Amino acid sequence: MQAVQQEIAQALNVQPPFADAAALEAEVARRVAFIKDCLANARLKTLVLGISGGVDSLTAALLAQRAINELRAESSDPAYRFIAVRLPYQVQHDEHDAQACLEVINADEVHTVDIAPAVRALAAEVQALKDGSPSLVDFVVGNVKARTRMVAQYTIAGARAGLVIGTDHAAEAVMGFFTKFGDGACDLAPLSGLVKNQVRAIARSFGAPESLVEKVPTADLEDLEPGKPDEASHGVTYQQIDAFLHGLPVEQEAFDIIVATYRKTQHKRELPFAP
């Protein structure tokens, strides 16, 4: 492991690879306990999470629903609830995957909020967008979508006295692959420190189908490039990112991309600048 790999892995609290099935189950139990502790410390009984159709939100939701199930069983209190939220922008091209995720999760409640009216209304009122190129406008509005989704989740959480769950994990964090104050905003991040293949392994341990576990990850924020794979945006694969974070050798080009992107996106992982 090179020094910079160790530095980044420590900064992101990267967890070691699962040695075996027992280690995986122990990690699942630890993260479920973490979720339960967050609710207890906040003196709240509701969790809210947006479901995209990808493996990250699927895995976080499976952990959340298990935590809620355990809390209900331990307390005999039916007030403990997990709310899964669908947040489409009009019609999502992979809606069938989102619905398949909901079937696997079996959430206590499912809410749907179409963010398109809010996103379009805001974009129509921002003069600066009228002068931008189509690609710039598409990128900026893509981030508006992510932030609107988080506003919707916090609105539900506020109405139901709940906490909002985030889906960030180490393989996304190192690349800064989240929208600042959008999907990067949450009250708790139960996947933090995991690499992508660990997220997939946890989903698989819950019995999630391989079609969802191995689905090609995509942020799907930009209209001009719908369904664009994350790896096309990164310039490296998740396999390379995972290897880097676990201190394994990676191709020099991939190494350089990961380090440069980590440094460039450092502001996303920190509190706002202050004097």
UniProtKB/Swiss-Prot annotation:
Belongs to the NAD synthetase family. GO terms for molecular function: ATP binding; glutaminase activity; metal ion binding; NAD+ synthase (glutamine-hydrolyzing) activity; NAD+ synthase activity. Keywords: ATP-binding, Ligase, Magnesium, Metal-binding, NAD, Nucleotide-binding. This is NH(3)-dependent NAD(+) synthetase. GO terms for biological process: NAD biosynthetic process. InterPro entries: NAD/GMP_synthase (IPR022310), NAD_synthase (IPR003694), NH(3)-dep_NAD(+)_synth (IPR022926), Rossmann-like_a/b/a_fold (IPR014729). It holds the Pfam family NAD_synthase. Homodimer. It comes from Pseudomonas putida (strain W619). The gene is nadE. Catalyzes the ATP-dependent amidation of deamido-NAD to form NAD. Uses ammonia as a nitrogen source. Mg(2+) binds at residues 56, 172. HAMAP family: NadE_ammonia_dep. Its EC number is 6.3.1.5. It is an enzyme of class 6 (ligase). Deamido-NAD(+) binds at residues 147, 180, 187, 267-268. It catalyses: deamido-NAD(+) + NH4(+) + ATP = AMP + diphosphate + NAD(+) + H(+). NCBIfam families: nadE, PRK00768.1. It comes from the Bacteria. ATP binds at residues 50-57, 167, 196, 218. Pathway: Cofactor biosynthesis; NAD(+) biosynthesis; NAD(+) from deamido-NAD(+) (ammonia route): step 1/1. CDD domains: NAD_synthase (cd00553). SUPFAM superfamilies: Adenine nucleotide alpha hydrolases-like. One of its GO terms (cellular component) is cytoplasm.
